Amino acid sequence: MARWRPDTAEREATPEALYLRRREFLALGAAGAVGLLLPRGARAGEPTGAALQVARKVDQAGGETPTPWDSVTGYNNFYELGTSKEDPSRNAGSLRPRPWTVTVAGEVKKPQTLDLDALTRMFPLEERVYRMRCVEAWSMVIPWVGFPLGDLVRRLEPTSRAKYVAFQTLLDRDQLPGQRRPVLPWPYVESLRIDEAAHPLALLAVGLYGRVLPGQNGAPLRLVVPWKYGFKGAKSIVRITFLADRPHTTWNDAAPDEYGFYANVNPEVDHPRWSQARERRIGEFFRRKTLPFNGYAAEVASLYAGLDLRKNY
């Protein structure tokens, strides 16, 4: 059976500049990369944006110090707003996060279109401090604000046929000017198995540092899956589709030998062009060891019992 794809002709675009920024990052080398990091003694900027009412705060990063606001909001991968790390923050003003709706479709008993403000009122918001590991071998610690994805999944009542959940980013060349270039086949789509989506660690984020989510970080709604590489976290979500079969996903389609469907953080499975055994924490000079499942093995390893994680990377 053919895999599900987003219903748009944009998926046919040729990804002519696929590796542009990822290669640039590698070419910087250790000395050049240091210039992108905040010095250890630098004073971080204060969080901006409207404050969110948070019901509880949970540290799920083992007491590690959160990455400063300046770095979390100024060093981003969001190709829809540009392919350099600084482009998303420069171009985020074009994104209009209100009004915003999310369409739920597919193998679900309660298909509907949800207003984002109504959606966020359904569930108490939590602040969760998570590690974030990029596939490019850098990392952050981020205090996200959101609600468990699993709570929404259960409320929508998936049918017995639902095995996967796909998340689709907004397709709008005016709001997301990076979509004017065929860097990737737009719109961006990512997916989880339904048991992954229902796991308590999976989060739909609407903010960070207690404030509404900035555009460059995927406003107004993004997926956060802390045991997976960052590209699994779809941003500016407008559609959630429950599916019987595994769907096409953007990076896995574009370069399947480099970006696996599962994308679990695994220091023993290298990217074809660099090691995944160590990472550079933004704000630090020396690399640190990468932890299996990004440090969340105790919580999530059982999801993959019996699965060859070298083949299913």
UniProtKB/Swiss-Prot annotation:
It is found in: Periplasm. Its main location: periplasm. The keyword Signal applies. It comes from the Bacteria. Disulfide bonds: none annotated. One of its GO terms (biological process) is protein repair. Mo-molybdopterin binds at N76, Y79, E80, C134, T169, N217, R222, G233, A234, K235. Its cofactor is Mo-molybdopterin. InterPro entries: MsrP, OxRdtase_Mopterin-bd_dom, OxRdtase_Mopterin-bd_sf, TAT_signal. GO terms for cellular component: periplasmic space. Keywords: Metal-binding, Molybdenum, Oxidoreductase, Periplasm, Signal. HAMAP family: MsrP. This is Protein-methionine-sulfoxide reductase catalytic subunit MsrP. It comes from Anaeromyxobacter dehalogenans (strain 2CP-C).
